[in-house]
């Protein structure tokens, strides 16, 4: 008999061994096997049975049942490899024979049987206990899914048909329940309870082909599972694949038993709260009360593994919400139960303090619970039901939950609101909150009139109501802002009123106040008239002290008188500090007017009394003291106490003792607070005011009173004083637990039993408001009465910090924070602190949003823009100032070396750049002028020969015209006929005769030697030469003829307009009612110069010589005339030497008397000449030293003739010697003025000796020659056509015109059309243009013609001139000479007056010359006196010395004669200027030489003081204009 065990299939099989029929067969079988030792055979059998191998299989992968659910499980597999014996039969253990033919003994058989039985039992136990050890353990969550991974191992790796079966072990007996069976091509078998939850995994999944998917796991699914794979058509003994799995199902906790949601209890009852939960693993039970863990105490405990919470003897602090929490590794659940006291309502959510704006809605909550739940809620405001408050009746609402709503709120709604709840059982419960209504500050009342007492302190009231509190008040007085903070005698009070410390009359006025608070203002008050009046005055004042005995009477007197204009004051008596008289006193008091009488005095009558006098102006007060003697002592006062642990020291001030003869002692009354019995202690020594009471308990509050006593008895008791003794020094702490605090902990280590803790603050929140962040919370529900203060902790990192600096009172439940940093996250906690403990609220997280300070950015941007604008403005101003200073410096240097170039320079400089008249362009005339030669294309070519004098040439271009019918029209360039009242005689001229020499054109030409210079630089014509012109000496003496610059003109009743359109300064000199400015304003004409000058030296002599030739008869030229002319110009200093005339005739040799006089101009009326030499500055004339004149140049100059000379600058004269032009070129010294100023300054002080030498060379015949100093001469312009189209007169240049043009293009655009002007003299007629009027340049003494400041290009003002207003035209006269004019005859040399074609005629030059020549003492004096220098206002303003100063007091000079020497043998003198006629010394045509003597020494100036005064006034006016200009330029 044998037993075999198939360990590979884990099945035990029993084989029954058969006995051979014959002994022979047994013996043969034994013989066929080798002999073995019994022990070895037994060992081999046991080894086959017990040989096992244990192998650890790697953990399987985590499987997922579905995408939505994941089964996380742990695989713990121990696979034991068993040794399998592959044999046809079972392994048989046979008895061992010891010898051949011997049989086993009974003992051996018994041993074998026992051994086999034991092995069978062990194998059976091994089968039962090996399954769990080899299983794969999987953990899954309840309700989720799991996959059992099972692989199929085919025999020899060849797929064969198989059956898949999954079994679940349902009992310890080993019975299996097939839950899933699968065979290919057959329907699946699923056990009941697993349908819809089990399935075979897909073949393309990463799991084994035999894997099973189990979903929606239940707790019953926990257990053992086996995967079986049975291969068909195989030997049953073939091994089978299979795996064991153990499934553990975990479940989150869930309650199986919970307490009721609301539990009603009575105080003193006991309750048990039961809370049980199921789950895998077993959950843990925790208890919380109002979000805080329940602390075990003698009355509160947790039992039965935390499932029960027992509360015995319920108190008020035990009422609240209790929460049971069950938790395990899979989650947690909670349940809350409310414990409410039955029988009375309890407020669960009390109201909180609120602050609202006016007009908003406010809600006060008041939630209450009670048993039974019929809770009634009532609301009160300041003790009155809100339903009964009339102001709230229509705006208040009470909800069912007890909340109070007020909508909208008003300022008067501020106050305390109380919520009271009750259900009829017990006392009502109440809670209160305060409502603060904020609104802008406003004025509630505005008195019409307020009075201030004169010379006393007074107050101007502003009745203000404000919430929040008032911040400031602004005041206005008489509609102007009042700054009381800047005044010493005005103080702004806390309520916004004005306190005047000493009133004066200046404080009277109309006042208004405007209050402001955090919400702004509601507006200003009305206007209050504040009147200053005298206050009432005391006429009788009470005495300072009244002493009376008990029972006596006292009479106190008081009276006052009102001030004038005020009401009579009222007088009343009162006790000190405004206390009214007591009832007992009123029966004993008599008041008569201002007198008061108190009878039957008592001790209580002792004290201070006030006499109050008041009216509408002021309230005055007089104080007196009434002392009652013979009474008990009065009560001590000002009691103070100092406490220790066991003693208190008291101090006080004694009261009135009852009289000086009474001595008082003191007794201390004290008791412990809350105790009814008082104890007394006498104070020793007698009269002491300090005592120490010992033997008191520590930490106890005591009450004290002090009473005085004298011989009359005990006095009055003092006020009660409360003092608390100090606590004993604390002993060393015991039972202190040492703990390591985390770095973020803000809690302090406290010993055990530190005292009761208050409940934690609730509902902590952080909200952002307009002015910061508001942290709010609610007071604790438990032990809120022990809260002493709150503390707020915060952190942004690990360290907790205290937010509030001081303690927050327990009634406050909010805190405003203003300095939180944007972009950070803050954590807050609120601590409720008691005396010895505290409790913390939950941590609140608040991220502060990152804020951009838009206002700061805007302010920065605006500030930056403003900064750049200011910088630009300052830079421009600095550049302008620097440029202006630089120009002034340059001009100052320029004026140091250059004479003031006036008329001729401006003429030449301006005409140099002129195009022909048709283009209408002009030159700016700036200094220096630009080089431009193209403008001379209309001129004849000239030679520029440096170092030679320049010949002045005045050409008569049309000598063939002999008719003088229109010849007088050409004199209109002197003065326009419509500018004077009676100018007809001005434009009439006699037939001037000159037989000195022939001009080559059939006419006669006078010698230059007839012209001499007077003391002031004017030219004088010899009278003898005048007589040859057809005027008699009587005519000249009678004043009917004017001799002006070599021309004689008859005038009759001329009334020249004295008006000038210029307003920029200057002075006028009056001569015989003919008014001329110091620098004469030319008539308002807009024509170019009519005179072209070809010299920079004393070229005016040629001009005068030309004037003498006007109208002269043609005659032979005297042999000495050219020499005179040469002498006149030989000493001249020049710069540009022009090409000689192409004609070899003399200067006026080609002039025809019958044709109009042709005057060279720059405007282009002459034929164009080829220009042989053009320097870099062709239009400049440099002042340079004369150099040797080449002979051929001199020959060319002397033989020049014709009419194409290159135009030169008449004003480029200077006595200063700059470097020679042959040596180097210097800066142009041309005048910087657009219009000349008619006068050249006298420069005799410079190079006087050189000038004298030049004059000697120029006058070899000893004739006196005054240096050239005359107004700018007139000039003519030749026109292309003889008839002129008259153009309107316009003033087309401002006073600073020259600076406005910097190039030719601008000049062409700015040019105005010039009027065509005609010039008719006696025997010539030539259409010519008129020189531009110098409207903006008078004398340099005028403030508008500043020497150095008004440089071209500077920022001087642009003064637009008024339009020209033409005066009435002069009347025509019927006759010019005696009866000839009356008879309608035109004498020889007279003018017809064609009004339609009469151009303007600049007579300003002639009138000014006459006025200046009259100031000279004698034209024949050998040496002219030096000009008087009036001086200058400052370094920039100079005055022409040759200009007399007019004044209202200055008499017109009528005794001055105009004496002109035109020839050594002919002298012409103009008599005194009287009336409108000029008188001649010789009759017309007379040849006798007759000279009128002049006074020897006449003053150069009429009235210097008046002139200086006028100069000062105009200087001040100029300074004012200059300041205005600078201000405008800066702005």
Swiss-Prot record:
Location, primary (coarse class): membrane
One Gene Ontology CC term in the entry: axon
Cross-referenced SMART domains: FN3, IG, IGc2, IGv
Positions in the Cytoplasmic compartment: 880-1531
Compositionally biased region (Polar residues): 1380-1389
Membrane-spanning residues: 859-879
Keyword set, alphabetical order: Disulfide bond, Immunoglobulin domain, Membrane, Neurogenesis, Repeat, Transmembrane, Transmembrane helix
Source species, domain of life: Eukaryota
Extracellular topological domain residue ranges: 1-858
Low complexity bias spans: 1333-1349
Disulfide bonds: 150-227, 275-324, 366-419, 462-513, 558-611
Identification of the protein by name: Protein turtle
Protein species of origin: Drosophila melanogaster
């Amino acid at each position: 008999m044998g037993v075999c065990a198939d360990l590979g299939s884990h099945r035990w099989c029993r084989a029954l061994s058969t006995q051979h029929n014959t002994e022979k067969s047994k013996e043969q079988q034994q013989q066929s096997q080798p002999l073995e030792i019994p022990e070895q055979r037994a060992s081999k059998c046991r080894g086959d049975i017990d040989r096992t191998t244990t192998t650890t299989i790697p953990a399987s992968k985590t499987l997922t049942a579905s995408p939505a659910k994941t089964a996380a499980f742990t695989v713990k597999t121990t696979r034991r490899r068993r040794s399998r014996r592959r044999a046809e039969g079972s392994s048989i253990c046979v008895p061992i024979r010891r010898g051949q033919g011997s049989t086993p003994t009974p003992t051996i058989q018994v041993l074998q049987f026992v051994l086999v039985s034991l092995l069978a039992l062990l194998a059976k136990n091994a089968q039962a206990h090996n399954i769990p050890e080899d299983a794969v353990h999987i953990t899954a969550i309840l309700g989720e899914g799991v996959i059992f991974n099972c692989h199929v191992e085919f025999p020899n790796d060849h797929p064969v048909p198989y059956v898949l079966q999954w079994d679940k072990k349902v009992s310890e007996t080993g019975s299996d329940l097939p839950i899933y069976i699968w065979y290919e091509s057959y329907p699946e078998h699923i056990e009941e309870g697993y349908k819809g939850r089990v399935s075979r995994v897909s073949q393309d999944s990463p799991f084994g082909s035999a894997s099973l998917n189990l979903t929606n796991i239940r707790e019953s699914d926990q257990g053992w599972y086996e995967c079986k794979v049975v291969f068909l058509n195989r030997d049953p003994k073939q091994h089978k694949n299979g795996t064991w799995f153990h499934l553990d199902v975990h479940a989150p906790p869930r309650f199986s038993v919970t307490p009721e949601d609301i539990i009603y209890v009575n105080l003193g009852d006991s309750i048990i709260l039961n809370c049980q939960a199921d789950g895998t693993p077993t959950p843990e039970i925790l208890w919380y009360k109002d979000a805080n863990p329940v602390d075990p105490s003698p009355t509160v405990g947790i039992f039965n593994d935390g499932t029960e919470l027992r509360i015995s003897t319920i108190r008020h602090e035990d009422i609240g919400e209790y929460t049971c929490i069950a938790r395990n590794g899979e989650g947690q659940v909670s349940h809350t139960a409310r414990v409410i006291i039955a029988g009375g309502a309890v407020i669960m959510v009390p109201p909180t303090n609120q602050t609202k704006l006016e007009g908003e809605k406010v809600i006060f909550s008041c939630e209450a619970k009670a048993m039974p739940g019929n809770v009634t809620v009532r609301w009160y405001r300041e003790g009155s039901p809100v339903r009964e408050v009339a102001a709230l009746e229509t705006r208040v609402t009470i909800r069912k939950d007890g909340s109070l709503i007020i909508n909208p709120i008003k300022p008067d709604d501020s106050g305390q609101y109380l919520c009271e709840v009750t259900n009829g059982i017990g006392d009502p419960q109440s809670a209160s909150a305060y409502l603060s209504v904020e609104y802008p500050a406003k004025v509630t009342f505005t008195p019409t009139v307020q009075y201030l007492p004169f010379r006393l302190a007074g107050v101007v009231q502003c009745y203000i109501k404000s919430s929040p509190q008032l911040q400031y008040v602004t005041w206005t007085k008489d509609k102007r802002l009042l700054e009381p903070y800047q005044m010493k005698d005005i103080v702004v009070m806390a309520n916004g009123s004005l306190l005047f410390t000493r009133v004066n009359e200046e404080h009277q006025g109309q006042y208004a106040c405007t209050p402001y608070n955090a919400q702004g203002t509601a507006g200003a008050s009305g206007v209050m008239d504040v009147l200053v009046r005298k206050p009432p005055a005391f006429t009788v004042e009470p005495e300072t002290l009244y002493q009376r005995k008990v029972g006596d009477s006292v009479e106190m007197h008081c009276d006052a008188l009102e001030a004038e204009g005020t009401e009579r004051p009222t007088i009343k008596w009162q006790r000190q500090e405004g206390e009214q008289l007591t009832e007992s006193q009123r029966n004993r008091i008599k008041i008569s007017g201002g007198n008061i009488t108190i009878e039957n005095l008592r001790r209580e009558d002792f004290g201070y009394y006030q006499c109050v006098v008041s009216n509408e102006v002021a309230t005055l007060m007089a104080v007196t003291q009434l002392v009652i003697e013979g009474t008990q002592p009065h009560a001590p006062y000002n009691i103070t106490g100092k406490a220790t642990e066991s003693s208190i020291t008291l101090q006080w001030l004694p009261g009135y003792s009852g009289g000086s003869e009474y001595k008082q002692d003191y007794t201390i009354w004290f008791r412990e607070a809350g105790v009814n019995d008082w104890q007394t202690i006498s104070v020793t020594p007698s009269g002491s005011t300090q005592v120490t009471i010992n033997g008191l308990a520590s930490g106890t509050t005591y009450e004290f009173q002090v009473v005085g006593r004298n011989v009359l008895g005990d006095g009055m008791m003092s006020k009660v004083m409360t003092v608390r003794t100090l606590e004993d020094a604390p002993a060393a702490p015991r039972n202190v637990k040492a703990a390591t605090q985390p770095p973020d902990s803000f809690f302090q280590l406290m010993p055990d039993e530190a005292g009761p803790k208050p409940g934690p603050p609730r509902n902590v929140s952080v909200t952002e408001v307009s002015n910061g962040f508001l942290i709010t919370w609610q007071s604790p529900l438990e032990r809120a009465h022990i809260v002493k203060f709150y503390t707020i902790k915060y952190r942004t990192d690990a360290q907790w910090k205290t937010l509030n600096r001081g303690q927050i009172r327990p009634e406050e439940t909010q805190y405003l924070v203003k300095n939180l940093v944007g972009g950070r996250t803050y954590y807050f906690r609120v601590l409720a602190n008691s005396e010895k403990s505290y409790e913390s609220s939950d941590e609140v997280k608040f991220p502060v949003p990152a804020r951009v300070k838009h206002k700061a950015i805007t302010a920065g941007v605006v500030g930056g823009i403003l900064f750049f604008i200011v910088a630009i403005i300052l830079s421009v101003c600095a550049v302008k100032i620097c440029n202006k200073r630089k120009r002034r410096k340059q001009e100052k240097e320029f004026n140091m070396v250059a004479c003031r170039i006036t008329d001729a320079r401006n003429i030449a400089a301006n005409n140099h750049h002129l195009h022909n008249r048709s283009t209408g362009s002009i030159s700016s005339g700036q200094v220096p002028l630009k080089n431009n030669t193209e403008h001379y294309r209309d001129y004849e070519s000239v030679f520029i020969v440096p170092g030679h004098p320049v010949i002045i040439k005045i050409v008569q271009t049309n000598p063939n015209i002999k008719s003088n019918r229109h010849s007088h029209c050409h004199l209109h360039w002197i003065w326009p006929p419509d500018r004077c009242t009676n100018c007809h005689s001005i434009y009439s001229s006699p037939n001037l005769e000159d037989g000195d020499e022939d001009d080559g054109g059939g006419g006669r030409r006078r010698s230059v030697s007839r012209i001499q210079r007077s003391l002031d630089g004017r030219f004088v014509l010899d009278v003898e030469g005048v007589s040859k012109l057809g005027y008699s000496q009587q005519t000249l003496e009678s004043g009917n003829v004017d001799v002006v610059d070599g021309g004689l003109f008859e005038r009759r009743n001329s009334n020249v307009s004295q008006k000038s359109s210029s307003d920029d300064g200057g002075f006028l000199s009056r001569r015989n009612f003919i008014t001329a400015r110091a620098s004469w304003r030319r008539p308002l004409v807009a024509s170019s110069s009519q005179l072209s000058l070809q010299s920079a030296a004393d070229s005016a002599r040629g001009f005068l010589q030309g004037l003498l030739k006007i109208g002269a008869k043609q005659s032979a030229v005297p042999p000495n005339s050219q020499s005179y002319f040469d002498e006149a110009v030989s000493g001249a200093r020049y710069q540009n030497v022009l090409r000689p005339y192409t004609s070899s005739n003399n200067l006026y040799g080609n002039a025809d008397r019958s044709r109009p006089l042709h005057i060279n101009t720059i405007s282009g009326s002459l034929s164009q000449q080829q220009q042989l030499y053009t320097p870099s500055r062709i239009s400049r004339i440099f002042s340079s030293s004369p150099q040797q004149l080449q002979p051929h140049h001199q020959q060319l100059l002397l033989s020049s003739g014709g009419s194409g000379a290159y135009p030169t600058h008449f004003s480029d004269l200077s006595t200063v010697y700059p470097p020679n032009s042959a040596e180097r070129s210097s800066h142009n010294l041309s005048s910087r003025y657009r219009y000349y100023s008619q006068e050249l300054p006298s420069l005799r002080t410079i190079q006087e000796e050189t000038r004298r030498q030049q004059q000697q060379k120029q006058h070899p015949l000893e004739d006196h020659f005054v240096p050239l100093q005359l107004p700018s001469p007139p000039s003519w312009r030749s026109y292309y056509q003889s008839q002129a189209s008259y153009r309107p007169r316009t003033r087309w240049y401002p006073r600073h015109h020259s600076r406005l043009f910097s190039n030719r293009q601008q000049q062409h655009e700015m040019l105005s059309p010039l009027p065509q002007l005609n010039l008719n003299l006696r025997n010539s007629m030539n259409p010519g243009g008129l020189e531009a009027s110098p409207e903006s340049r008078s004398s340099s003494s005028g403030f508008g013609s500043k020497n150095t400041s008004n440089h071209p290009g500077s920022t001087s003002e642009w003064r637009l001139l008024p339009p020209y207003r033409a005066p009435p035209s002069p009347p025509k006269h019927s006759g010019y000479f005696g009866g000839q004019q009356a008879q309608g005859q035109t004498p020889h040399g007279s003018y017809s007056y064609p009004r339609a074609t009469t151009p303007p005629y600049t007579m300003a030059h002639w009138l000014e010359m006459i006025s200046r020549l009259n100031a000279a003492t004698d034209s024949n004096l050998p040496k002219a006196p030096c000009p008087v220098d009036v001086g200058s206002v400052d370094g920039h303003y100079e005055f022409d010395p040759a200009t007399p100063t007019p004044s209202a007091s200055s008499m017109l000079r009528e005794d001055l004669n105009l004496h002109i020497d035109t020839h050594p043998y002919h002298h012409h003198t103009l008599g005194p200027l009287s009336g409108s006629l000029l008188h001649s010394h010789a009759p017309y045509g007379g040849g006798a030489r007759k000279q009128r003597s002049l006074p020897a020494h006449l003053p150069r100036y009429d009235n210097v003081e008046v002139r200086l005064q006028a100069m000062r006034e105009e200087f001040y006016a100029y300074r004012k204009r200059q300041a205005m200009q600078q201000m405008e330029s800066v702005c």
